[in-house]
């Protein structure tokens, strides 16, 4: 295990244009502490530019308020609905841009990696992941909305991945590079 010198605040983001879930955890050595969770929502009647602007402003505000040392974002997974994949990709882009502009390092995790880190089973269902998020953070109930629980799961995934790579020097989380 790591010593108590490892401290970081992690913002996890589950991208979406209607609802962007987020969760903040604090890692202190081998301990993980719940900070907050929520969702940035946009009205369905808004055009895409206005929705993306709201998401960008919301993520920027979260970064200013919580001052994370890392932002973990769920990678886009293959989706048979091309329109959904495109809009989720746009929301991801907004989150990545907000973190980049704030100078915060960004890490990406696939849904499989998140499930594996949280439940030790890459094919876990949504309810299993949510229940483990609740248990790992010592919460009385499963965080709502679902997107916010996913944001917390992504933040926890980063904390676990970061802790393991720091302890072993192997399998470092993939940070996005500024090339």
Swiss-Prot record:
<protein>
    <recommendedName>
        <fullName>Crossover junction endodeoxyribonuclease RuvC</fullName>
        <ecNumber>3.1.21.10</ecNumber>
    </recommendedName>
</protein>
<dbReference type="GO" id="GO:0048476">
    <property type="term" value="C:Holliday junction resolvase complex"/>
</dbReference>
<comment type="similarity">
    <text>Belongs to the RuvC family.</text>
</comment>
<dbReference type="GO" id="GO:0008821">
    <property type="term" value="F:crossover junction DNA endonuclease activity"/>
</dbReference>
<keyword id="KW-0233">DNA recombination</keyword>
<dbReference type="GO" id="GO:0006310">
    <property type="term" value="P:DNA recombination"/>
</dbReference>
<dbReference type="InterPro" id="IPR002176">
    <property type="entry name" value="X-over_junc_endoDNase_RuvC"/>
</dbReference>
<keyword id="KW-0255">Endonuclease</keyword>
<dbReference type="GO" id="GO:0000287">
    <property type="term" value="F:magnesium ion binding"/>
</dbReference>
<dbReference type="Pfam" id="PF02075">
    <property type="entry name" value="RuvC"/>
</dbReference>
<dbReference type="InterPro" id="IPR012337">
    <property type="entry name" value="RNaseH-like_sf"/>
</dbReference>
<feature type="active site">
    <location>
        <position position="14"/>
    </location>
</feature>
<dbReference type="GO" id="GO:0006281">
    <property type="term" value="P:DNA repair"/>
</dbReference>
<feature type="binding site">
    <location>
        <position position="14"/>
    </location>
    <ligand>
        <name>Mg(2+) 1</name>
    </ligand>
</feature>
<keyword id="KW-0479">Metal-binding</keyword>
<keyword id="KW-0460">Magnesium</keyword>
<keyword id="KW-0378">Hydrolase</keyword>
<keyword id="KW-0227">DNA damage</keyword>
<dbReference type="GO" id="GO:0005737">
    <property type="term" value="C:cytoplasm"/>
</dbReference>
<dbReference type="GO" id="GO:0003677">
    <property type="term" value="F:DNA binding"/>
</dbReference>
<feature type="active site">
    <location>
        <position position="147"/>
    </location>
</feature>
<keyword id="KW-0238">DNA-binding</keyword>
<comment type="function">
    <text>The RuvA-RuvB-RuvC complex processes Holliday junction (HJ) DNA during genetic recombination and DNA repair. Endonuclease that resolves HJ intermediates. Cleaves cruciform DNA by making single-stranded nicks across the HJ at symmetrical positions within the homologous arms, yielding a 5'-phosphate and a 3'-hydroxyl group; requires a central core of homology in the junction. The consensus cleavage sequence is 5'-(A/T)TT(C/G)-3'. Cleavage occurs on the 3'-side of the TT dinucleotide at the point of strand exchange.</text>
</comment>
<dbReference type="InterPro" id="IPR036397">
    <property type="entry name" value="RNaseH_sf"/>
</dbReference>
<feature type="active site">
    <location>
        <position position="74"/>
    </location>
</feature>
<feature type="binding site">
    <location>
        <position position="74"/>
    </location>
    <ligand>
        <name>Mg(2+) 2</name>
    </ligand>
</feature>
<comment type="subunit">
    <text>Homodimer which binds Holliday junction (HJ) DNA. The HJ becomes 2-fold symmetrical on binding to RuvC with unstacked arms; it has a different conformation from HJ DNA in complex with RuvA. In the full resolvosome a probable DNA-RuvA(4)-RuvB(12)-RuvC(2) complex forms which resolves the HJ.</text>
</comment>
<feature type="binding site">
    <location>
        <position position="147"/>
    </location>
    <ligand>
        <name>Mg(2+) 1</name>
    </ligand>
</feature>
<keyword id="KW-0540">Nuclease</keyword>
<keyword id="KW-0234">DNA repair</keyword>
<keyword id="KW-0963">Cytoplasm</keyword>
